[in-house]
UniProtKB/Swiss-Prot annotation:
Gene3D superfamilies given in the database record: Anticodon-binding domain (3.40.50.800), Bira Bifunctional Protein, Domain 2 (3.30.930.10), YbaK/aminoacyl-tRNA synthetase-associated domain (3.90.960.10)
PROSITE patterns membership: AA_TRNA_LIGASE_II
Catalytic reaction equation(s): tRNA(Pro) + L-proline + ATP = L-prolyl-tRNA(Pro) + AMP + diphosphate
Subunit structure: Homodimer.
A GO molecular-function annotation: ATP binding
Protein name as catalogued: Proline--tRNA ligase
Function as written in the Swiss-Prot or TrEMBL entry: Catalyzes the attachment of proline to tRNA(Pro) in a two-step reaction: proline is first activated by ATP to form Pro-AMP and then transferred to the acceptor end of tRNA(Pro). As ProRS can inadvertently accommodate and process non-cognate amino acids such as alanine and cysteine, to avoid such errors it has two additional distinct editing activities against alanine. One activity is designated as 'pretransfer' editing and involves the tRNA(Pro)-independent hydrolysis of activated Ala-AMP.
Organism annotation: Shigella boydii serotype 18 (strain CDC 3083-94 / BS512)
Name of the top EC class for this enzyme: ligase
SUPFAM superfamilies: Class II aaRS ABD-related, Class II aaRS and biotin synthetases, YbaK/ProRS associated domain
Annotated gene: proS
Lineage: Bacteria, Pseudomonadati, Pseudomonadota, Gammaproteobacteria, Enterobacterales
Xref: InterPro entries: aa-tRNA-synt_IIb (IPR002314), aa-tRNA-synth_II (IPR006195), aa-tRNA-synth_II/BPL/LPL (IPR045864), Anticodon-bd (IPR004154), Anticodon-bd_dom_sf (IPR036621), Pro-tRNA-ligase_IIa (IPR002316), Pro-tRNA-synth_IIa_bac-type (IPR004500), Pro-tRNA-Synthase_IIa_type1 (IPR023717)
């Protein structure tokens, strides 16, 4: 490709509304342009990267035995009503009616559509297992699209769905998809972790996320410093303290704390160790409960894990925190003064709280706290559960090493769905015993557009993007200095361009009438891995300057050796 026949569209300045580095660099490198909130046009450079990602995904899915299909973006509402997700999915599901007043949705995912297809196409266990995938546009009406294509409303996704007659068969495909995803992200040159995860609104039993490690990530990824254990922080188990609860050394005392409405204020004003404080959070109880609210207690320096809390049988789903009005109606005190003593509603405490003694907590009286609280002396030990987020340094749940926490960007997710959708949509086949058998399902997603942004978040420097070779828009940039004034430079540039293309190498020849500084800046911004610079001074010695984008190293290579050298660098 020649720049004179290409839409380069690079920008010198960073757009003001671009928050994260991937959004900034995708705009500056001429990869995308914003059409509306959460909607982007992909320009030629962006499309080239996108296609590289797609091709790797497609190759590995095919290698794993999956079969490619294509399903409509527009889906009839009755399928979503049949599955029960019409009400469950919420406002992210874009709903509309056609001219015949028939309701439809823009598909955020395709469990309903594929299950409907399979219930009409398959009849016997002999046709299974099967695994179908597509790479297709999805739409989720995000309330606040942000971070460019990282959290956009329209995006490209690879979604796959497998069908089985046994859990054992599902496990085999699940393991194959786990391995395929690992190959996909390894081929792309990404530093990633596969972590245990919550199944969320998709449902099902087992689940793993594939997280690209990056400081800008929205998720906390937890992993052991010794073993292979890794999990999303939502799912990581916080192990109970090994040490037995210390004996009480203080009497419980009611203390006036009118200006301490938060743990931080309590600690500062009374010089308390934060590890000796407890915070109390009130959430709505499950419908039909004899109490409207449930009290959840975690140590002052810990955070409530909302996913774990929502799974408590007495807690309403989705988890909803009580308003001050609702709290006062039940406890007669405000949010800054709550604690376990004389709490008139059910209480669940974290494992760490259960091991505490001589601790401080609200007295359920405005402006007052109890100091020196001890379980079973001042208040009965309530139900104990794991309801907090782990922190760095906690013991690993597998008993090996301690936990580290890094930020991650979720780029893939695999689920064992079980029979959630097949039961709802009555998808079954005749089993080996001749009886009707509901199908067992798995689903497997990769955010293709998100992978592009995640790769940038992990691969950039002060000059621009530093693409891993496998997904770079071009493999080689040819920069001929003053080619429009030097016939020798122009002739060699054309010769190398032809020879490299003949070797199957993707080349961008910068044949613009631009200053060398502009040419260098653009190629580094775009992130092309290999650059060769042709100039009269070096050609006098039969040399060409070669530069590797990732480490910035330069070397002079003889003109007659450059093609062979590049082929070896790129193809090995």
């Amino acid at each position: 490709m020649r720049t004179s026949q290409y839409l380069l569209s690079t920008l010198k300045e960073t757009p003001a509304d671009a928050e994260v580095i991937s959004h900034q660099l995708m705009l500056r490198a001429g990869m995308i342009r914003k059409l509306a909130s959460g909607l982007y046009t992909w320009l030629p450079t962006g499309v080239r990267v996108l296609k590289k990602v797609e091709n790797i995904v497609r190759e590995e899915m095919n290698n794993a035995g999956a079969i490619e299909v294509s399903m409509p973006v527009v889906q009839p509402a009755d399928l979503w009503q049949e599955s029960g997700r019409w009400e469950q999915y919420g406002p992210e599901l874009l709903r509309f009616v056609d001219r015949g007043e028939r309701p439809f949705v823009l598909g955020p995912t395709h469990e309903e559509v594929i299950t409907d297809l399979i219930r009409n196409e398959l009849s016997s266990y002999k046709q299974l297992p099967l695994n179908f995938y597509q790479i297709q546009t999805k739409f989720r009406d995000e309330v606040r699209p942000r971070f460019g294509v990282m959290r956009s409303r329209e995006f490209l996704m690879k979604d796959a769905y497998s069908f089985h007659t046994s859990q054992e068969s599902l496990q085999e495909t699940y393991d194959a998809m786990y391995a395929a995803y690992s190959k996909i992200f390894s081929r792309m040159g990404l530093d990633f972790r596969a972590v245990q995860a919550d199944t969320g609104s998709i449902g099902g039993s087992a689940s793993h996320e594939f997280q690209v490690l990056a400081q800008s990530g929205e998720d906390d990824v937890v992993f052991s410093d010794t073993s292979d254990y890794a999990a999303n922080i939502e799912l990581a188990e916080a192990i109970a303290p090994k040490e037995p609860r210390a004996a009480a050394t203080q009497e419980m005392t009611l203390v006036d704390t009118p200006n301490a409405k938060t743990i931080a204020e309590l600690v500062e004003q009374f010089n308390l160790p934060i590890e000796k404080t407890v915070k109390t959070l009130l959430v709505k109880a499950v419908e039909g409960s004899s109490f409207p609210l449930v009290a959840l207690l975690v140590r002052g320096d810990h955070e409530l894990n909302e996913v774990k809390a929502e799974k408590l049988p007495q807690v309403a789903s989705p988890l909803t925190f009580a308003t001050e009005e609702e709290i006062r109606a039940v406890v007669k005190a405000g949010p800054g003064s709550l604690g376990p003593v004389n709490m008139p509603i059910p209480v669940v405490i974290d494992r760490t709280v259960a091991a505490m003694s001589d601790f401080a907590a609200g007295a359920n009286i405005d402006g007052k706290h109890y100091f020196g609280i001890n379980w079973d002396r001042d208040v009965a030990t309530p139900e104990v559960a794991d309801i907090r987020n782990v922190v760095a340094g906690d013991p690993s749940p597998d008993g090996q090493g301690t936990l580290l926490i890094k930020r991650g960007i979720e780029v893939g997710h695999i689920f064992q769905l079980g029979t959630k959708y097949s039961e709802a949509l009555k998808a079954s086949v005749q089993g080996e015993d001749g009886r009707n058998q509901i199908l067992t399902m798995g689903c497997y997603g990769i955010g293709v557009t998100r992978v592009v942004a995640a790769a940038i978040e992990q691969n950039y420097d002060e000059r621009g993007i530093v693409w891993p070779d496998a997904i770079a828009p071009f493999q080689v940039a040819i920069l001929p200095m003053n080619m429009h004034k030097s016939f020798r430079v122009q002739e060699l540039a054309e010769k190398l361009y032809s020879e490299l293309r003949a070797q199957g190498i993707e080349v961008l020849l910068d044949d613009r009438k631009e200053r060398p500084g502009v040419m260098f800046a653009d190629m580094e911004l775009i992130g092309i891995p290999h650059t060769i610079v042709l100039g009269d001074r070096n050609l006098d010695n039969d040399d060409i300057e070669y530069k590797y984008r990732r480490n910035g190293e330069k070397q002079l290579i003889k003109t007659g050796d450059i093609v062979e050298y590049l082929v070896k660098q790129i193809k090995g």
